[in-house]
């Protein structure tokens, strides 16, 4: 698994999977602050 030759770089996987997670967390906190999070 350490050999990234011919595979997707680990930093690319972390970026692609990290951005949506951060976005969802941001939307969750934004919804809770605006009062929409309580309905979820």
UniProtKB/Swiss-Prot annotation:
What the entry lists under Pfam families is as follows:
PsbJ
> Major place of localization?
plastid
Q: What GO biological process term is on the record, naming one?
A: photosynthesis
- Gene3D superfamilies, from UniProt? 6.10.250.2070
Q: Which keywords does this chain's UniProt record carry?
A: Chloroplast, Membrane, Photosynthesis, Photosystem II, Plastid, Reaction center, Thylakoid, Transmembrane, Transmembrane helix
Q: How does it sit in the membrane?
A: Single-pass membrane protein
Please list every transmembrane segment annotated in the UniProt record, as residue ranges: 8-28
Q: How does it assemble?
A: PSII is composed of 1 copy each of membrane proteins PsbA, PsbB, PsbC, PsbD, PsbE, PsbF, PsbH, PsbI, PsbJ, PsbK, PsbL, PsbM, PsbT, PsbX, PsbY, PsbZ, Psb30/Ycf12, at least 3 peripheral proteins of the oxygen-evolving complex and a large number of cofactors. It forms dimeric complexes.
**What PANTHER family does this protein's entry cite?**
PHOTOSYSTEM II REACTION CENTER PROTEIN J
- Designated name of the protein: Photosystem II reaction center protein J
Supply the source organism for this entry.
Answer: Vitis vinifera
Q: Which gene encodes it?
A: psbJ
